[in-house]
Amino acid sequence: MARRKNHSIKIENNEKENQILVSLSIVALLGGCSEEQVQRDVYQSLDDCLADWKKIELCEADKNTESTQKTATTQQQGLGLNIRDNGNAESAVKNPAENNAQANQSENRAESTTKAESTDPSLGAAIAGGVIGYMAARAISSFLGPSYHPGNRAVTTPTGQVVQPQTNRSVGKPMLVKGNAGSMNSKPVSRGGFSSPNKTHRSSGG
């Protein structure tokens, strides 16, 4: 009787250990799904990124490079302003009559420009803002493409459109990103296994 009890206790312990192992495996798998590893292409310019992904909302400026360039540009602009101010001060002392004539001409030009833009100022401001934004983006020397799964260089937009580049103008190796995959503008196309796309089967009519 004692042997039978010991045998049954061992079986129960083995079953509990197996249940614990199975539950740990499930937790590990779920953790792997939530902490997906994706990658992003690195580009030297906005034009290169657009050549691959076709949509400007899929290209993002590298924040590290952008902050560094802004600091350098601000310093250069400060030096340039000091030089121009000194030059203007010297010319004002030398040629006061010429400066007055130039000032009158610039005022007339400003008035004519204001009259021309007064018909639709909002449109002019929108166009100017868009052009300035695009030119500022082109001045940045490092851009990142959207996040995608290794081995499947494709993303989906919020409207459901799948974008898969046919070219690759990125430089170096893609940047690996861990954690929450995707952004507001795109999501990586599923590799299969965790979520499968809906498939429609068409029946052939006889």
Swiss-Prot record:
Composition-biased stretches (Basic and acidic residues): 108-118
Disordered: annotated segments: 64-123, 155-206
Polar residues bias locations: 66-79, 182-198
Low complexity bias (residue ranges): 97-107, 155-167
Disulfide-linked positions: none
Protein name listed in UniProt: Uncharacterized protein HI_0930
Organism of derivation: Haemophilus influenzae (strain ATCC 51907 / DSM 11121 / KW20 / Rd)
